[in-house]
């Protein structure tokens, strides 16, 4: 991000250089690449989280397995590599969702900035929410396909979708359910993405800015680790309930009468709350944070390193 790469102690008061079209495009590309690289490492944890979120759905009964027991159960019944199902969709999701939200964050921030000075944190939150919404709209089709591929092993054999890959999944959803169905669950996904980007990108931006301004930290790996860990925790607490709702809506089959299991975000929220209680919204929180923590840390470290490589390449070709 444009404000991520400053080493000035007085970063709170230092004007930010005016952005160029090339630098703005670079942030879209770097954001997407960083998201894809981190997702390749954390996808099995995300699959584990999805399975845990779907436990006892609609009834509140049935096995309540923790992360370790669920991992052992999946390994025994389906094999460990089942956790890599949906990886192609996960990579496409990062290529669309993360590319858009990271790129838009810098783009919008540069537009609303006054006198080339860093934005107040409240404005960063608003920018984060706007860029998250844009990312969700672009990334929902891949996200929907990923959730279905991850959850397929939980369904009875006759109900499994058996998508070959993300593109096969998107094609079949469009053909069998209509193109609009690719945005099934977009509402909770959009809300989640708004809170995620505000909690994740804005928190990282602000935490790093304050750390550098204190004079006790430098723009190095230690600062990046602390800032990204803080951002991961804030984002996980804020978005876990929305992630559970999103997962359930995206994975929900039609009932025997042909109706959808959930009419929308608030219907899913109320049904889940009545049947399972508030704790249901934090089902799978441990693997959620175990995945979001490393993914957030890796994403921002990759962003920082890719920015360094970009600067070196620019000086090399001058």
From Swiss-Prot:
GO cellular component: mitochondrial inner membrane; mitochondrion
A Pfam family it matches: Mito_carr
Solcar repeats: 22-111, 119-210, 219-309
Keywords on record: Membrane, Mitochondrion, Mitochondrion inner membrane, Repeat, Transmembrane, Transmembrane helix, Transport
BP terms from Gene Ontology: dicarboxylic acid transport; malate transmembrane transport; oxaloacetate transport; phosphate ion transmembrane transport; succinate transmembrane transport; sulfate transmembrane transport; thiosulfate transport
Coiled-coil portions: none
Topology class, membrane: Multi-pass membrane protein
PROSITE patterns according to UniProt: SOLCAR
Record localization: Mitochondrion inner membrane
UniProt superkingdom: Eukaryota
GO molecular function, one term: oxaloacetate transmembrane transporter activity
Spans traversing the lipid bilayer: 28-48, 79-99, 125-145, 185-205, 225-245, 281-301
UniProt cross-references to PANTHER family, sorted A to Z: MITOCHONDRIAL DICARBOXYLATE CARRIER-RELATED
Family, per entry: Belongs to the mitochondrial carrier (TC 2.A.29) family.
Functional summary from the UniProt entry: Mitochondrial solute carriers shuttle metabolites, nucleotides, and cofactors through the mitochondrial inner membrane. Catalyzes the transport of 2-oxoglutarate across the inner mitochondrial membrane in an electroneutral exchange for malate or other dicarboxylic acids, and plays an important role in several metabolic processes, including the malate-aspartate shuttle, the oxoglutarate/isocitrate shuttle, in gluconeogenesis from lactate, and in nitrogen metabolism.
Protein name: Probable mitochondrial 2-oxoglutarate/malate carrier protein
Gene, per the UniProt record: ucpC
């Amino acid at each position: 991000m444009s404000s991520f790469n400053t080493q000035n102690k007085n970063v709170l008061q230092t004007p930010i250089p005016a952005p160029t079209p090339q630098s703005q495009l670079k942030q879209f590309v770097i954001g997407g690449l960083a998201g894809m690289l981190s997702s390749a490492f954390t996808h099995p944890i995300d699959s584990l989280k999805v399975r845990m979120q779907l436990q006892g759905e609609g009834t509140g009964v049935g096995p309540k397995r923790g992360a370790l027991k669920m991992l052992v159960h999946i390994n025994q019944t389906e094999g460990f590599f089942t956790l890599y199902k949906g990886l192609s969709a996960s990579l496409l999701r990062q290529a669309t969702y993360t590319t858009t939200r990271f790129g838009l964050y810098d783009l919008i921030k540069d537009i609303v900035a006054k006198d080339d000075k860093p934005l107040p944190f409240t404005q960063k939150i608003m920018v984060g929410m706007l860029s998250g919404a844009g990312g969700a709209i672009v990334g929902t089709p891949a996200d929907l396909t990923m959730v279905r591929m991850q959850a397929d092993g939980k369904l009875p054999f006759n109900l499994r979708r058996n998508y070959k890959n993300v593109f096969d999944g998107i094609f079949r959803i469009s053909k069998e359910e209509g193109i609009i169905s690719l945005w099934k669950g977009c509402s909770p996904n959009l809300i989640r993405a708004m809170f995620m980007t505000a909690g994740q990108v804005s928190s990282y931006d602000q935490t790093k800015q304050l750390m550098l301004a204190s004079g006790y930290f430098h723009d190095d790996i230690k600062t990046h680790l602390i800032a990204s860990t803080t951002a991961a925790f804030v984002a996980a607490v804020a978005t876990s309930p929305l992630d559970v709702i999103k997962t359930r809506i995206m994975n929900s089959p039609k009932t025997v009468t042909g109706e959808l299991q959930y009419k929308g975000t608030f219907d899913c929220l109320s049904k889940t709350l009545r049947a399972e209680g508030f704790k249901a919204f934090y089902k799978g929180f441990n693997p959620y944070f175990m995945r979001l923590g490393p993914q957030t840390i890796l994403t921002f470290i990759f962003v920082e390193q890719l920015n360094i490589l970009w600067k070196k390449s620019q000086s090399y070709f001058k």
